[in-house]
Amino acid sequence: KLNNPILIGHSQGCLQILEYAYKYKNKINKAVFIGGSNKMPVHPDLIELAQNGDSEAVKLMMKWGYEGSKKFIGGNPVEKIIKSPRDISEILALDLIACNNYVNGHDAAKSINCPVLFVFGELDKMVNIEAGKKFANLVKDSKTHIIKGCGHMIMIEKAFEMREKVLEFLK
């Protein structure tokens, strides 16, 4: 049994927090949404690429998630995690479909009644700043922090700044 948890999610994980908050009102102590939105539509072509196990799906996501923000020594870490056609078709495709099909985000966000921190990457093309601000405005008790020079993969690109802001909020 969880008693007043603090929930922290990134991207699709934000949708999971939203649904938890909606189903278990008054049970959350605080929440942190990192690079998320109350709705996360996914282009049908990207879903199709992922369903077919095409590595182009991962390349496109990484382009949108990182482009213009940071280059990694040794290559992009996400491409090392999701690398086989099976990973793409059985894991990534299902995640993209779940994001695309989630429709309760607006009502769920409006129902949140605990303090919330929103963290967005200034250069994020997957959840742009405007979508993020609209999301944050749905929540009564919220603070927003935008990390400059950062894309969608905030916890990898700007880990220290993100951690500092989250810890500051949790105190």
Give residue spans per PLM region.
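Flexible "cap/lid" loop of the alpha/beta hydrolase fold
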Residues: 15-59
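Hydrophobic "lid"/C-terminal helical patch
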Residues: 96, 135, 162, 166, ...
